[in-house]
C-alpha cells in the first residue's frame, strides 16, 4: 500500500501575532480604574491647603486634586507601562513591542474621548470639562506621538532589513499603506498643534484636530492586525456618537437682544441675551458656548464654538455677557476694522446664533454653601466671572468679609460695567457694610472730571491666548507689572488718585489710578479674618491673565487659603 505524502500545515501567523491583545484589554482596565479613582478623588479628596502640613505636601495635594497633567499623566502611564516589556525579547521579537505601541495609542482613545464629554454625567457633580483642558491637551499629544512612533519604527525596521522590500511592505500592502496614511495625518496634526501655529490659526488647528481624530479612529481598525474592532472601535464610535448627540440635543437658536459697545474707547462690550435660553437655575460664574452657524451647517461641526462667561445671575431677567471682542485694531478705529479681522468673532444683533449648551464653573460646591470670608481678584474681562460671584456672596447674610479687586487698563472699561449695573438696577447700598467693597485699579492715566485721557503704560507680553470667550489676546496687555506689585516697598512718587464715582454705589466702589497695587496690602483684612474662621469658609477667586493667576496662587499657597481660578487656554 502506497503511503500518502506527509502534509505540513504552516501557521499563517507567528506565535507572537496575538501577543498584544491582552495588553490592550489591560490598558482599557487601567483607564476604567483611573476614572473611578478620579471620581473618588473629586468626591472625597481635599483641595484645601492644610495649615499644619508642609508647603511641599500642600502643593502636591493641590496639583493632584487640580488634575495637573504632570501628576495625573505620570500616574496613568506608570500603570500602563508596567507590563509593557514582558516575556518577549526586545532584540529578536521587537515586532511585538512595535505593534504594542500602536495598540497602546488606540486603546487610550476611549479615556480621552470620555474626559472631553460635554456634559460628562459621570463626573458632572465634582468636575467640569474645563478642568480637563490641560490634561486633554497633553494626553492627546502623547497618544499621537505614540502612534507616530509606531509607524516610524516600523519604517526604520523595514528600511534596514535587506531581506524586506520597503516598497512592498509599506505601499503595496493595503493594511500597511493605510497605517502610512494615518502616520502622515498624525504628523500634520502635531505640526498644527505647536503653540505658535495653534495660536496663529486656531481654526485650522481645530479643523485638523477633529478630522484627524475621526480618521485615526476609523482607519486604525482597517490597518490593525489583529483587529481592534471590539471593544475599542465600538467604544470610540459610541463616545463619538454621544459627543454628536450632545451638540444636537442641548443646542438651541438665539438672537441678541441688545449690544452696548463703544469701539472708539474700548473693545469691552456688553451683550444681552434672552433669559429663556438657559434653565431656571445655573451656578454663578457659569459659561455658555455659542456657534455662529446652525446645526445643519457643516461649519457648525468643523469650526470651534466660542465660550462666554455669564455675567448675570439666574434670578436676573436676561443673560448678560461682558466680553472683549478680539481685534487687531487699536481703540479709536472703526468697527469695520474689527469685522475685517479674520481672527475676530463678535456678536451682532441682526444675526441668529446657536447656543450649544451651558456649563457650570470649576467652583467646589462647599464654597457656595460654606464661604463667609471671600476675596475675588480679576483682570480685564475677567469681571464677567467675578461680578456674579460678588453678587452671590453679597446677598448672603452670613458673609463676614467680601472684597472684589478689578485690574483694568483704562477707565472706559469701568464705565461700561458701571452702565451695565445702572441699566439693570443693580445697587448694593441696602446691604452695605464696611466689610464689603469693590476696588478698581486702572493702570492707565485718567482724570475723574474728563475720563478721556486713557494712556496705557508699557506692558509685558504674556504671550498667551485663551479659549474662553471672556478672555482673549486683548487681555494679554494687562500685566501685574503695570501696578508695581513686585515693588511693594518702593518710594514711588507717582501720585495716586482715588474716588468713589457713583451715587448708587458710592460707598461700595472705590476707583484708583496709578496706585501701587500689592495683593498682601489689599487683602490684609481678608487675611486677618481667615485666621478667625474655619478653613472651609475662606476662599480666594482669581480670573485674568497668567501673571495675575500666578500671583494669586502663590499668595494662597503661602497663606494656606482655598484657591479657585478660572483658566481657559488654547
From Swiss-Prot:
Gene3D superfamilies: Nucleotide-binding domain of ferredoxin-NADP reductase (FNR) module. Residues 481-505 have a biased composition (Polar residues). Pfam families: FAD_binding_8, Ferric_reduct, NAD_binding_6. GO terms for cellular component: plasma membrane. Its EC number is 1.16.1.-. Keywords: Electron transport, FAD, Flavoprotein, Ion transport, Membrane, NADP, Oxidoreductase, Transmembrane, Transmembrane helix, Transport. Residues 481-507 are annotated as: Disordered. The keyword NADP applies. GO terms for molecular function: ferric-chelate reductase activity. It is a multi-pass membrane protein. Residues 250-388 form the FAD-binding FR-type domain. CDD domains: NOX_Duox_like_FAD_NADP. The keyword rRNA-binding does not apply. It is found in: Membrane. Probable cell surface metalloreductase. May be involved in iron or copper homeostasis. Belongs to the ferric reductase (FRE) family. AIM14 subfamily. This is Probable metalloreductase AIM14.
Amino acid at each position: 500500500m502506497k503511503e500518502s505524502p506527509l502534509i505540513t500545515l504552516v501557521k499563517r501567523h507567528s506565535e507572537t501575532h496575538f501577543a498584544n491583545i491582552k495588553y490592550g484589554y489591560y490598558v482599557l482596565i487601567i483607564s476604567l480604574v483611573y476614572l473611578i479613582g478620579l471620581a473618588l478623588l473629586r468626591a472625597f479628596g481635599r483641595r484645601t491647603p492644610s495649615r499644619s502640613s508642609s508647603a511641599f505636601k500642600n502643593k502636591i495635594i493641590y496639583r493632584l486634586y487640580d488634575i495637573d497633567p504632570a501628576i495625573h499623566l505620570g500616574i496613568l502611564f506608570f500603570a500602563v507601562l508596567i507590563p509593557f516589556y514582558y516575556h518577549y525579547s526586545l532584540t529578536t521579537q521587537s515586532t511585538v513591542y512595535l505593534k504594542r505601541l500602536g495598540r497602546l495609542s488606540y486603546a487610550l482613545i476611549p479615556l480621552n474621548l470620555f474626559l472631553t464629554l460635554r456634559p460628562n454625567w459621570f463626573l458632572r457633580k465634582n468636575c467640569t470639562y474645563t478642568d480637563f483642558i490641560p490634561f486633554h491637551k497633553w494626553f492627546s499629544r502623547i497618544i499621537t506621538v505614540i502612534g507616530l512612533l509606531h509607524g516610524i519604527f516600523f519604517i526604520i525596521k523595514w528600511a534596514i532589513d535587506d531581506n524586506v522590500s520597503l516598497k512592498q511592505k509599506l505601499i503595496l500592502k493595503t493594511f500597511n499603506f493605510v497605517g502610512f496614511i494615518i502616520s502622515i495625518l498624525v504628523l500634520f496634526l502635531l505640526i498644527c498643534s505647536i503653540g505658535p501655529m495653534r495660536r496663529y490659526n486656531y481654526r485650522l488647528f481645530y479643523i485638523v484636530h477633529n478630522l484627524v481624530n475621526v480618521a485615526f479612529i476609523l482607519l486604525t481598525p482597517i490597518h490593525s492586525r489583529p483587529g481592534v474592532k471590539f471593544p475599542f472601535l465600538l467604544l470610540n464610535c459610541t463616545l463619538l456618537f454621544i459627543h454628536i448627540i450632545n451638540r444636537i440635543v442641548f443646542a438651541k437658536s438665539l438672537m441678541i437682544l441688545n449690544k452696548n459697545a463703544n469701539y472708539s474707547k474700548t473693545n469691552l462690550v456688553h451683550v444681552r441675551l434672552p433669559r429663556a435660553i438657559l434653565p431656571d437655575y445655573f451656578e454663578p460664574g457659569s459659561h455658555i458656548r455659542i456657534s455662529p452657524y446652525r446645526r445643519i451647517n457643516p461649519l457648525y461641526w468643523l469650526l470651534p464654538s466660542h465660550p462666554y462667561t455669564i455675567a448675570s445671575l439666574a434670578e436676573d431677567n436676561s443673560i448678560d455677557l461682558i466680553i472683549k471682542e478680539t481685534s487687531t485694531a487699536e481703540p479709536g478705529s472703526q468697527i469695520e476694522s474689527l469685522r475685517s479681522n479674520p481672527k475676530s468673532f463678535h456678536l451682532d444683533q441682526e444675526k441668529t446664533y446657536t447656543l450649544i449648551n451651558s456649563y457650570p464653573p470649576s467652583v467646589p460646591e462647599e464654597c457656595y454653601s460654606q464661604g463667609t470670608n471671600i476675596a475675588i481678584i480679576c483682570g480685564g474681562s475677567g469681571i464677567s466671572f467675578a461680578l456674579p460671584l460678588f453678587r452671590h456672596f453679597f446677598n448672603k447674610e452670613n458673609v463676614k468679609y467680601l472684597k472684589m479687586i478689578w485690574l483694568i487698563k483704562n477707565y472706559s472699561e469701568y464705565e461700561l460695567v458701571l452702565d451695565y449695573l445702572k441699566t439693570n438696577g443693580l445697587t448694593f447700598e441696602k446691604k452695605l457694610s464696611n466689610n464689603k467693597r469693590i476696588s478698581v485699579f486702572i493702570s492707565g492715566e485718567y482724570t475723574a472730571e474728563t475720563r478721556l485721557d486713557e494712556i496705557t503704560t508699557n506692558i509685558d507680553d504674556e504671550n498667551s491666548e485663551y479659549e474662553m470667550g471672556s478672555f482673549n489676546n486683548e487681555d494679554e496687555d494687562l500685566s501685574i507689572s503695570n501696578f508695581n506689585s513686585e515693588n511693594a516697598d518702593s518710594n514711588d512718587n507717582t501720585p495716586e488718585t482715588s474716588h468713589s464715582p457713583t451715587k448708587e454705589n458710592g460707598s461700595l466702589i472705590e476707583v484708583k489710578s496709578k496706585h501701587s497695587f500689592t495683593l498682601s496690602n489689599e487683602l490684609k483684612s481678608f487675611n486677618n479674618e481667615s485666621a478667625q474662621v474655619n478653613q472651609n469658609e475662606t476662599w480666594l477667586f482669581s480670573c485674568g491673565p497668567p501673571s495675575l493667576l500666578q500671583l494669586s496662587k502663590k499668595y494662597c499657597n503661602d497663606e494656606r487659603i482655598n484657591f479657585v481660578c478660572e483658566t481657559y487656554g488654547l
